[in-house]
Amino acid sequence: MEKEENKMEKIISLAKRRGFIYPGSEIYGGLAGTWDYGPLGVALKNNIKKLWWKKFVSERDDMYGIDAAILMNPKVWEASGHLSGFSDPLGKARFNLMFKTQVGAGEEASPSYLRPETAQGMFVNFKNIIDSFHPKLPFGLAQIGKAFRNEIAPRDFLFRAREFEQMEVEYFVEKESWQTYFEEWKKEVEEWMEEIGL
């Protein structure tokens, strides 16, 4: 394990020296689990997002791109089970990983949450897409966006951060054909990852 940690430290050090990524708020002591992308990191990240969008949205006739809000009505998170089940163990208790915030001021303020994933934004807009574009199954919704998780112990560089970006597709199919489409998507994603050198 020590060898793996040493390797990760070397990768982080190289990425910082070369201008890819820096610890967030570093000149003020940092904030665990937050990272700032430097000039080369931003360029790399934007190129990956552009290639992903081209492959999985622009070049397909069955995909609709959206950009859903980061803040959503708390009922969304209640209905999806995030309020009761999106947690990590903390001793004998459970710790909800969602960042809680307030919308509005003073006594009029109401609770809200920073989204912990992008999927729910696509699900709540499903009917809007149906009403606007009338797609037939199969079709998908795609989104690239920020997500936030109040990690108990952020670690492993970018792999367990408090703020991160996701590139996500929700693909809707007839129940009996899910396995066929799952295998097709799995193959497409593997091919794309190979194309970009992962």
Positions of predicted regions on the chain:
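TRNA-recognition modules of translation machinery and tRNA-sensing kinases, especially anticodon-binding
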Residues: E2-L198
